[in-house]
Amino acid sequence: NKVTILFNEYIKIEDATNKVVVSPPQLEVPEIKAVGKKIVVELNDTLKPDVTYTIDFSDAISDNNEGNPLGNYTYSFSTGERIDTFEVSGTVLNAEDLEPIKGILVGLYDDLSDSVFKTKPLQRVSRTDSRGHFVIKGVAPGTYRAYALQDASGDYYFNQMSEAIAFSHQTFEPSCKPDIRQDTIWRDTLHIDSIIRTPYIHYYPDDLILMAFTHEQTNRYLIKTERQEPNQFRMYFSYGNPEIPRIKGLNFDSDNAFLIEHSAKRDTITYWLRDTTLINQDTLRMELQYLISDSAGVLVNQIDTIDALPKVFYEKRMKERQKEIDKWMKEQEKLRKRNKSYDSIVPVKPLEPHWVNASTIDPDKNVLVSFSTPLERLDTSMIHLYVKVDSLWYRAPFEFGPKDSIPRTYELRAEWREGQEYSLEVDSAAFCDIYGLASAASKQGIKVKTNDEYSSLFVKVSGINDNKLIVQLLNSSGGVVKQVRPHGGTAEFYYVTPGKYYLSAIFDANGNGVWDTGDYDADRLPEGIYYYPHVIECKAKWDVTERWNVTEIPRTQQKPAALVKQKADKEKKLQNRNAERAKKLGIPIPDEYRW
């Protein structure tokens, strides 16, 4: 079970655990070490009869002096009378954003049943490189299915829901044929010597695409409880549930003690303390009853005792507050001695609304306002909106109410007319929080931009059922600026701020308006994501029209390079260094180092 590979110079091996892949996979980790001019690989598993073994070193081997990698070196041997030589290659992408996934395990089964991925180790394996590309070598003739696995448990099959996986319904038979490729011979790092036609064996399939995803976390458990601020504590769950946890105070009265907020998915729950006495109490001990998943995934009742402690204790907060008061009193005393106006009562800070989009606004957006604490009361009769027509101000109709799924955020909706000026005037005490703090009076102008400041973008989509499509306009960082559903084959984007943009699309199979991950047990692939491969420049006053055949090019080539975060390693530079070194040593350049 020991393999020794000899070299003509001293070598070293880097990160063998992650870079070197033995196939068939070894459940007992092989021992791999470099000793002088040789590499010794000791396989601790019992070798299987009549099987081709491959030891893929990737770029782990390099010379000891200059660190030039050998690159893409694989050692093969067989325990039978023949060596299987077929190869299968392709790419693994993140299903949610088409990012190449580096270092994920990719493997094959000739057992085509769905259960095999959850019961038996992969038969032949490889790992992806920085481009998400993989090559599985030493494959025997047969019919296969390919899988990818972020193997957290190290057992080469899918047994943890938190593991990223990929699967495909496609089956294939490996094959090969003679082919010709064009290779470049470099004179040096800048100049090409010649381009030659090199015969080689082309292995198929070479274009497998696997979309990796992580299952939606449905096992429910309490992640943590924290009390960052003295007036609230927050519970984080792995998965939401409509039933809110029940709390029984052990050292305080919990009846009507809280105002409860929850996130859209109900996986984060915030309890605001109503009573000042509880806010000033450093330790809140409580009995918490909530639903948790048992080992079978069934929701059962769980009872825990929890202590909620603030980040800063009451005594320290009071000392800091006293320092602020002392500083204020000294300032007032200075004013008094100078015979200037001063106060004798420490002012109470008003409730401060945080207005968003309140000075300049797009015609298709609304003004938002958020608060740091929950409101007890708001009076819309104390909110006034005026529009300027010619030189006169007139009342403008509006609606004011909570913003969906965003706690403590409200939306001022109105018919914002392009180029118009508005005045938003709020009377004092229009807003009052649960602690009795009231807002001060405020007045601010709102300017609606003109149509001449925008571009319009029309995207004519084809190649896919556009009734299920959501087209997204992306900024230079890949963030979603706008999203629409196409109508009559055209996605229409209005009021686009001038700039450079990209496009992506979701094939919304279930019509819920968001991307959904896959489910292996349900044999459901993740919903499709697509990218328009070119940048789009939108200029003010321009109507831009683009045609996009969503499925025209493979998804491995769709995502614009500017948006790809997982950048490919500089393989060309490394191979050039090997070519230069071979030239210095006066030896022929091996085919695998020609670019």
Identify the role of each PLM range:
Residues 1-595:
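N-terminal targeting or signal-anchor segments and their processing/structural boundaries
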